Amino acid sequence: MAAFSEMGVMPEIAQAVEEMDWLLPTDIQAESIPLILGGGDVLMAAETGSGKTGAFSIPVIQIVYETLKDQQEGKKGKTTIKTGASVLNKWQMNPYDRGSAFAIGSDGLCCQSREVKEWHGCRATKGLMKGKHYYEVSCHDQGLCRVGWSTMQASLDLGTDKFGFGFGGTGKKSHNKQFDNYGEEFTMHDTIGCYLDIDKGHVKFSKNGKDLGLAFEIPPHMKNQALFPACVLKNAELKFNFGEEEFKFPPKDGFVALSKAPDGYIVKSQHSGNAQVTQTKFLPNAPKALIVEPSRELAEQTLNNIKQFKKYIDNPKLRELLIIGGVAARDQLSVLENGVDIVVGTPGRLDDLVSTGKLNLSQVRFLVLDEADGLLSQGYSDFINRMHNQIPQVTSDGKRLQVIVCSATLHSFDVKKLSEKIMHFPTWVDLKGEDSVPDTVHHVVVPVNPKTDRLWERLGKSHIRTDDVHAKDNTRPGANSPEMWSEAIKILKGEYAVRAIKEHKMDQAIIFCRTKIDCDNLEQYFIQQGGGPDKKGHQFSCVCLHGDRKPHERKQNLERFKKGDVRFLICTDVAARGIDIHGVPYVINVTLPDEKQNYVHRIGRVGRAERMGLAISLVATEKEKVWYHVCSSRGKGCYNTRLKEDGGCTIWYNEMQLLSEIEEHLNCTISQVEPDIKVPVDEFDGKVTYGQKRAAGGGSYKGHVDILAPTVQELAALEKEAQTSFLHLGYLPNQLFRTF
């Protein structure tokens, strides 16, 4: 308790932490908690299982509690920040809703960006919900630009998401990253008219008074959202006219200037100079902290940690909510209506609730992106940017938005780019460094060579069902084709997985497969061996964890594995990131991952908490043809076995190349063992029992002491001689030195 209290953690949280047997903070917690409590943005990286969740959860809970306590007691923050409310009272481009290199003149109408490599955008201070409206834009030079309309959710890069409509100088209209020919090109001295008919749901443009025709029909999901004038520039200058001055080309057909729009049609921007009116008012659906997780399992795990940490916090109590798919939305909405302080969720459902206004982000003080590299690799960068754009950078009490990013790979280009965009001078806490295999993990490779091990020929039909990639190919023995060897690899891997379990008498292991169908097939093969989900205690009892299983089943399967009801968890990489599974003695990689970082994530499941673990990877020596779905159904009902380059959904998978990349990444050569999977005892560890703690000190420590003993004795003799000499100099009758 004292260790956490010394970092400034409040006693109520420290007491809860002590009950969890956390006597001392981990390295990542000791570094990050004071930084976050101090108000800074933090980028943190540490090994899986190092306490990253606690490192951000503890300070977030404390600051949210302190904020609510201040509000309860009527305290106000000391702030000298200008509200910028006067900006919202006139039609102009919004200085609080623009890119970092986007300049706005003193009149609020003349805009410029001189960045030659990047696009920078801006939105107006007001938007519209009803009516037929028009504004003009004049081009002052020959730079590139797009003009049009967007919602508050849209990216400032107009036309690159589903919330904005743009028309560019190259004669292209753009929406949701789709650029189509429209109208004609425009450049310096041209005037573009931007028309919006909300009642009909139409957007169109004109050039120098020439009507270019219908450009877009507003989709249903945007019908109830305000649309704001918007633009994006690359080394260009524009001037807007919202109707305060006379139009060069006045609109017809009942379109009116924005400046003449009735007040009832107008919506003011949420970006109002950092202190929004809504922030001072209690909104039940406006949390103080938002934590985004890449998977439902991680979200549930984080929420459980928050519940444990806040156990003794009272007056006011903190209210948390889990927002994930697969759960009835009405249950989540009813909790939102009653008030919530901390939200933990996954991007899909969060996006739905934010876009429909059910979840309000106007009071968020903390934005936490857990496993950020996983979020980015799943394609959620646009969602993150949209969400960040909707959160005020400074709250009404003068506190700045804090952004915390946790990632297994901080040094990836995408994570660095994201941090530059949404974080404010972040502190990097990197206790992970380059990927490496922990000392407690013994990892080996088993080559799967169908040319030397002909077992697959003798099995007949009593083998694992394969993934039907070769359903239309001749894979019978004797064909000697790449397809035959590929099918043989699939069969052998099923046999080797069973052999590894029997050879090492595995009582618990995580088995990673590349695809969901591979997981299902291996589970079915274990059922044929007498095991399966319902055979508790059987040598091959197992459960599956992947995206096609129902949420309730996934949660139940994970719990059954943790409790030891079944021995094996067969999963895709969904379980490789952050899921709280401790001390698993074995991991089997049926197929190597296509991303080398995921190899470290996978084998990081074993050997935690000083327990020894063994990771066995089955690596094909020949290329294997595998599914790689690029179809819209993402594999559901797809049987297109042609190669990707031929318009199909398969690729040739080269595991030997992947193995060399992993070895280069880890700067080591991974030991190989024979197909009998008898793993020689590691010479450093002596006798090893996987899953048990290494003997403290070990035999190697004794040898180390023996080597150092003569040197230590010599140092002791020199120290004694020096001390004796000093005493003689100080106390001899004829002292040579005396202190006067």
UniProtKB/Swiss-Prot annotation:
A GO cellular component entry from the record: cytosol
Gene: DDX1
Annotated effect of mutating K52N: Abolishes ability to promote guanylylation of RTCB
Residues found modified as Phosphoserine: S481
Region Necessary for interaction with RELA: start-end pairs: 1-525
InterPro entries in the record: B30.2/SPRY, B30.2/SPRY_sf, ConA-like_dom_sf, DEAD/DEAH_box_helicase_dom, Helicase_ATP-bd, Helicase_C-like, P-loop_NTPase, RNA_helicase_DEAD_Q_motif
Protein name as annotated: ATP-dependent RNA helicase DDX1
Domain writeup: The helicase domain is involved in the stimulation of RELA transcriptional activity.
Reactions catalysed: ATP + H2O = ADP + phosphate + H(+)
Main location: nucleus
Organism: Homo sapiens
